[in-house]
């Protein structure tokens, strides 16, 4: 049976260069212990929408693409529902430079996927959720460069300046000239600007969002966007879509390098855990059995929801329904976020 403190022994044995990163189990996202209950087969409802909203300009964003690209939005039903909103599909937030994609309203089945033997008690029961409004969601996790543009600092463990001097010396010892070593590390530093920001707390994210008029997605919005109408535990082969312990080389990676889902979102699973706006409730789904509309979680509690898995954890955490949680003041190199906005 899995330890609810997320494999403290495993974390202590992770790759050597993460030794300076706090791996205390007290700071880990926490998951419930799985049960042996056989998951039910759930059929997703019809999610079509009849919106006739006229095409709308957005004062807060620059429009990159008005209509959804069928090469990106590969689900025909989702493509039609996005177009039916009349809203621009792909936009860039002016205050942060974050690229965002439109998610249409609709219904989906939230929680344990049919046949998912790894589903935990807090993912049950699966239940119907209706989201009545479209929303925008960051195409990727917030990057270090985007965070620095707004916050003016970089709290990340994996940041560009951390080991550059020692890397230059190492490259010179390997035969490169000083100028060659500096050029090589400069490129690597530029790449790291596109790594996800991490070591940010839920409270830090709230401050970022207050400055940009963005917000964290609700847990329901997050899972809806992650699934993209897929009722399987993941939206693709986990090695193709996510960075996790077996393929991450013990670190985060540049966003957008794995395959996206059918809505065009990258790294919904793996790379870093993502904060959601909701207060975490372990038994919350039991109150949702009859279906819910625009849910925002429980009203009381101390912890906040975390979703998606991380570069340092097993692949079974990279599941669309997996639910974790953490203290809102918790900062560590396994946790980042992506932003949302209501049009």
Task: Please identify what each model-predicted range represents.
Residues 55, 116-130, 230, 249-251, ...:
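Surface-exposed recognition segments
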Residues 96-109:
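Mature N-terminal segment immediately following signal peptide/propeptide cleavage
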Residues 1-12:
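Bacterial N-terminal signal peptides that target proteins for export
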Residues 30-46:
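Short, low-complexity, disordered segments immediately C-terminal to signal peptides
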Residues 242-265, 297:
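A short, contiguous structural element within a folded domain that forms the immediate neighborhood
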């Amino acid at each position: 049976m899995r330890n609810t403190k997320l494999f403290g022994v495993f974390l202590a044995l992770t790759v050597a260069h993460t030794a300076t990163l706090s791996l205390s189990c007290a700071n880990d996202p926490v998951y419930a212990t799985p049960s042996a209950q056989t998951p039910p087969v759930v059929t997703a409802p019809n999610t079509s929408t009849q919106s006739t909203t006229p095409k709308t300009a957005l004062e807060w964003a620059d429009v990159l693409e008005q209509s959804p690209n069928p090469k990106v939005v590969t689900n025909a039903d989702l493509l039609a529902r996005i177009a039916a909103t009349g809203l621009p599909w792909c936009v860039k937030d002016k205050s942060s430079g974050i690229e965002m994609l439109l998610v249409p309203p609709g219904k989906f089945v939230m929680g344990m996927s049919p046949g998912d033997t790894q589903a935990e008690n807090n993912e049950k029961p699966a239940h119907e959720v209706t989201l009545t409004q479209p929303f925008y969601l960051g195409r990727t996790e917030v990057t270090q460069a985007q965070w620095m543009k707004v916050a003016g600092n970089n709290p990340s463990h994996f940041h560009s300046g951390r080991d550059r001097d020692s890397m230059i010396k190492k490259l010179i010892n390997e035969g490169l000239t000083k100028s060659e070593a500096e050029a090589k590390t400069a490129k690597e530093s530029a790449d790291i600007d596109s790594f996800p920001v991490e070591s940010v707390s839920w409270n830090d994210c709230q401050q970022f969002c207050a400055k940009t008029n963005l917000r964290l997605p609700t847990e329901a919005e997050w899972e809806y966007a992650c699934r993209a109408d897929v009722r399987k535990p993941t939206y693709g082969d986990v090695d193709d879509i996510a960075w996790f312990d077996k393929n991450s080389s013990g670190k985060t990676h540049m966003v957008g390098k794995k395959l996206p889902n059918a809505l065009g979102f990258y790294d919904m699973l793996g790379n870093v855990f993502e904060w959601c706006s909701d207060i975490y409730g372990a038994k919350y789904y039991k109150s949702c059995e009859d279906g819910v509309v625009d849910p925002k979680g429980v009203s009381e509690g101390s912890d906040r929801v975390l979703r998606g898995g991380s570069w340092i954890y097993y692949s079974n955490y990279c599941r669309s329904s997996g639910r974790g949680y953490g203290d809102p003041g918790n900062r560590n190199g396994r946790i980042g976020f992506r932003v949302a906005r209501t049009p």
